[in-house]
Amino acid sequence: MEEAGLCGLRRKADMLCNSESHDILQHQDSNCSATSNKHLLEDEEGSDFITKNRSWVSPVHCTQESRKELPEQEVAPPSGQQALQCNRNKEKVLGKEVLLLMQALNTLLTPEEKLAAVCKKYADLGNSPLL
């Protein structure tokens, strides 16, 4: 009986990991200086991220993909203005992560499920290149 409960917790906690927000985080981090990215979150503000496509994007895949786009150019460290814009984008993305977490927590019933989901999300964000 306990095993079935744990599987249910794990399944609901995995819901947070498989949201589209992880894709946005990876995309924002790999293309931090691109001007088109600042409109990405603004376009999606009215939509419900939890019920949308829940595909997992590997961090390794995103990193390799962004490097393939500029094979001959060296990636220079961001200038002061680019670093400022990058930090703003990261703050927006993390704010969106908080919103997603709150929406997901509202769908869970018990405090145990909510705690498991928060722990899972914290671990995922700890592995994120944004932090």
From Swiss-Prot:
Please give the InterPro entries that the UniProt record associates with this protein: Taxilin_fam (IPR026183)
What are the recorded GO MF terms, alphabetically?
syntaxin binding
The lineage's top-level taxon is Eukaryota
Family, per the entry? Belongs to the taxilin family.
Q: What is this protein called?
A: Putative gamma-taxilin 2
Give the organism, scientific name.
Pan troglodytes
Upper lineage ranks?
Answer: Eukaryota, Metazoa, Chordata, Craniata, Vertebrata
